[in-house]
Regions:
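N-terminal secretory targeting modules
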Residues: 1-54, 107-111, 116-137, 154, ...
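Conserved beta-strand->loop/alpha-helix structural units within folded catalytic cores of enzymes
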Residues: 146-156
């Protein structure tokens, strides 16, 4: 617990995105990161989780740079009047997100999981989330890896709602990070699949599995 988390600290802002430093230093809302006994930025879980909404993702789900009550799981909880459990993790790759969803299904038999997928270039290598996998690098590889994770969770016997992080955030990134915002034109992935996933990623479209 503390006032900073991951990229949400003045040192990172000064080094990586100095043009935002004034905004950072004059942000009007008080930000504090408090984690529950399971290691997530959320209140303690209720004893009965049979009818909760499970929210899985990266720092966008955790609510990096936001008060806890303004994270999207917290807002969803207010809108639905149902307990929404925040399983956001700073820097989580889609590999980690998919593994977490499968574990939730195995342990809790959930009724509904909402996934906010992360950037395609992030990978889980040797059990650690990294910015990219140098041994499996590029747009085609990233899309194939994403589809692997997408299919793995979409085959689970529960309702899944898919969301994505806003890729416009890459405007402040370097060339390596921008790769996942570009269209891939390799031959290994069919054009209909490419169009579907790129439309989903670009427009933050919600797709509900019935």
């Amino acid at each position: 617990s503390g006032p900073y988390s991951s990229t949400d600290n003045p040192k990172h802002t000064e080094q990586e995105t100095p043009k935002h430093l004034e905004h950072f230093n004059n942000y009007p809302k008080k930000i504090y990161y408090k984690y529950n006994s399971k290691g997530f930025r959320d209140n303690e879980w209720p004893e009965d989780v049979s009818d909760v909404i499970w929210c899985v993702g990266d720092s966008f789900t955790l609510g990096c740079g936001q008060p806890q009550n303004e994270s999207w799981p917290a807002v969803l909880e207010k809108l639905t009047n149902k307990r929404c459990i925040n399983l956001g993790q700073d820097g989580a790759s889609n590999d980690t997100i998919a593994l977490r969803v499968q574990e939730i299904q195995k342990v809790y038999n959930p009724k509904l999981i909402v996934i906010m997928w992360s950037y395609l270039h992030r990978r889980r290598v040797n059990g650690i989330d990294v910015g990219s996998d140098k041994n499996d690098f590029g747009d085609d590889a990233d899309i194939k890896n994403f589809l692997k994770n997408y299919d793995a969770v979409n085959s689970l016997p529960t309702k899944i709602i898919h969301l994505t992080v806003p890729l416009s955030m890459y405007n402040d990134g370097d060339e390596l990070m921008k790769q996942s915002e570009r269209t891939a034109y390799g031959n290994e992935i069919s054009e209909p699949i490419k169009k579907k996933i790129l439309f989903l990623m670009k427009n933050n479209v919600t797709e509900v599995k019935q």
